């Protein structure tokens, strides 16, 4: 529905001895339809009302004395002053460059300027100023759940249960985001009883018509912190009161987007090589340290294996991609050969090896949690218009806390090996590729979706090779004829349906990663 209104706009044009008064009519259209959407990208700021302005000139009725002229309106400010926000540090942060400011966990800071989404200028209570990583702080509001130790924003149901079992205390609890946007779940550890084993209960925090939060309908509160405080002192509908908040805050430092703001080049003299931990498409990978206190993975790039100049330019862009489910790129060493790529270190190594080494030990909930982690990372890449091109279990890594992160996104564009680049080459990942890739070399987020379906299959077969008895040519023929991978025996039908939806012949028939994430999360919450 379109609402139209007519407004008279009067403007005054002054000269040295007279002014002319013009009246214009402007027709304003306001869309009241909730179904209409804005375009995703704007190439320029549009003003549709501009072309609808019509001038109605009026002649001067006489001279206006200079003393009676209306003053011109003041010029608008060149910049809108950004409101300063108070934040609280979630982690300690030691300065890495002279421009950095130290952070101490739980202390408050004032944000002065946001240089980019990942690095902000802040001031501490003593007046010291400097740059800090934005993912180390959170806005200091009583309604902001991130300031509380018991809140975990980005955690799956399985990861929550793993944390609570490690704590293994009656009443140990966390609060986490639920599968429904804007809703939350309390997960509580219940000790063993005479007739029951230890268990973990999950309680949905709901909202009533008055906007109050509750678990037990008789006890509703204006905010979630108030609700948690009440249930820390009263069970009131729960199996036990909330006794021990279980948190990660401060215990596991997240990676930062680069070692500092705009720092993409790393001095090789600042790196110490500890031991070789593997090898890949481009060369040997070492465990190392940067400036003797940050563990890193150092990839030495074999000369001639990569288009180095193109990659260096791309690395500057890749460093701006920062997400808890992506392996963080810290920078590159270009001062001498070979070129080094420095990334976040993941203690449990490659996901494919992790699955094979732990065969028979991983519960189905853990396998689904792996898929959920990867889907979260891929949804972030999709949202930012970035294509992986080689998504597979071999290109995902596992942290010390069993969080899975995506590695090597976009790297295949810089490979110079024809055996890997050509779809007819022996090293080309045909078994993870959709028809439009192996036939026309056409990549998109939807080709990544196909690969994600195959990766899910790898996870639920605990590391089997897809199409293990078929050659690349046979796989191409089978896929073209409509053949798809079978359902793994560890995968319930609900999981296989998600996998299968990724393998639609046409890209437009496949779901987005945002849709896949909702589906996987829904299954995880109902198991």
From Swiss-Prot:
Protein name per UniProt? Tyrosine-protein kinase TXK
- Tell me which UniProt keywords the record has, alphabetically: Adaptive immunity, ATP-binding, Cell membrane, Cytoplasm, Immunity, Kinase, Lipoprotein, Membrane, Nucleotide-binding, Nucleus, Palmitate, Phosphoprotein, SH2 domain, SH3 domain, Transcription, Transcription regulation, Transferase, Tyrosine-protein kinase
Q: Which Pfam families match?
A: PK_Tyr_Ser-Thr, SH2, SH3_1
The similarity annotation says: Belongs to the protein kinase superfamily. Tyr protein kinase family. TEC subfamily.
Q: Does the UniProt entry include the keyword Membrane?
A: yes
Activity control note: Activated by phosphorylation by FYN.
Q: What are the protein's GO molecular function terms?
A: ATP binding; non-membrane spanning protein tyrosine kinase activity
Gene encoding the protein = TXK
Report domain SH2 positions: 150-246
**Enzyme Commission numbers on file:** 2.7.10.2
Q: What does this protein do?
A: Non-receptor tyrosine kinase that plays a redundant role with ITK in regulation of the adaptive immune response. Regulates the development, function and differentiation of conventional T-cells and nonconventional NKT-cells. When antigen presenting cells (APC) activate T-cell receptor (TCR), a series of phosphorylation leads to the recruitment of TXK to the cell membrane, where it is phosphorylated at Tyr-420. Phosphorylation leads to TXK full activation.
Gene3D superfamilies reported for this sequence: SH2 domain, SH3 Domains, Transferase(Phosphotransferase) domain 1
Q: Which organism is it from?
A: Homo sapiens
A GO CC term?
A: nucleoplasm
- The entry's ATP-binding residues are 277-285, 299
Residues that span the membrane, as ranges: none
Its annotated compartments are: Cytoplasm; Nucleus; Cell membrane
């Amino acid at each position: 529905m379109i609402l139209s209104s007519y407004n008279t706009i009067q403007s005054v044009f002054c000269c040295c001895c007279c002014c002319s008064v013009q009246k214009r009519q402007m027709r304003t259209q306001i869309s009241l339809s909730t179904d209409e959407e804005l375009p995703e990208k704007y190439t320029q700021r549009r003003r549709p009302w501009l072309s609808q302005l019509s001038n109605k000139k009026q002649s001067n009725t006489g001279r206006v004395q200079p003393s009676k002229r209306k003053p011109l309106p003041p010029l608008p400010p060149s910049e809108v002053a950004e409101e300063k926000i108070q934040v609280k540090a979630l982690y300690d942060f030691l300065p890495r460059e002279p421009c950095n400011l130290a952070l101490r966990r739980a202390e408050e800071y004032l944000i002065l300027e946001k240089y980019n989404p990942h690095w902000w200028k802040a001031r501490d209570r003593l007046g010291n100023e400097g740059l800090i990583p934005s993912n180390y702080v959170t806005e200091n509001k009583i309604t902001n759940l991130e300031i509380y130790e018991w809140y975990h924003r980005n955690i799956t149901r399985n990861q929550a249960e793993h944390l609570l079992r490690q704590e293994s205390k009656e009443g140990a609890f966390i609060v986490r985001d639920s599968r429904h946007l804007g809703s939350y779940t309390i997960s509580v550890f219940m000790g063993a009883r005479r007739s029951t084993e230890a268990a973990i209960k999950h309680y949905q925090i709901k909202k009533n018509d008055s906007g109050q939060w509750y678990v037990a309908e008789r006890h509703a509160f204006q905010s979630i912190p108030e609700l948690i405080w009440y249930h820390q002192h009263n069970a009131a509908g729960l199996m036990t009161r909330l006794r021990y908040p279980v948190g990660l805050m401060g215990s596991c430092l997240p990676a930062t987007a680069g070692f500092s703001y705009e720092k993409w080049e790393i001095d090789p003299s600042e790196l110490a090589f500890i031991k070789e931990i593997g090898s890949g498409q481009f060369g040997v990978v070492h465990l190392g340290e940067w400036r003797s206190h940050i563990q890193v993975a150092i990839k030495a790039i074999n000369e001639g294996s990569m288009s180095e100049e193109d990659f260096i330019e791309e690395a500057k862009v890749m460093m701006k991609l920062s997400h808890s489910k992506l392996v963080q790129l810290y920078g590159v060493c270009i001062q001498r050969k070979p070129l080094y790529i420095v990334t976040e270190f993941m203690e449990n190594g490659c996901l494919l090896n992790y699955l094979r080494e732990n065969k028979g030990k991983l519960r189905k909930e853990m396998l689904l949690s792996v898929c959920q982690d990867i889907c979260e990372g891929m949804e972030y890449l999709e949202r930012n218009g970035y294509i992986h091109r080689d998504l597979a279990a071999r290109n995902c890594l596992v942290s010390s806390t069993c969080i899975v992160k995506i590695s090597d996104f976009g790297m295949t564009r810089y490979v110079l090996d024809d055996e890997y680049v050509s779809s007819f080459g022996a090293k080309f990942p045909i078994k993870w590729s959709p028809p439009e890739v192996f036939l026309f070399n056409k990549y998109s987020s939807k080709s990544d979706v196909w690969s994600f379906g195959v990766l899910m299959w790898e996870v639920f077969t605990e590391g089997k090779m897809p199409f293990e008895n078929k050659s690349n040519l046979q796989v191409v023929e089978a896929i073209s004829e409509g053949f798809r991978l079978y359902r793994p025996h560890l995968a319930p039908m609900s999981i296989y349906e998600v996998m299968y939806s990724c393998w639609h012949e046409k890209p437009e028939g496949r779901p987005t990663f945002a849709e896949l994430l909702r589906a996987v999360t829904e299954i995880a919450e109902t198991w």
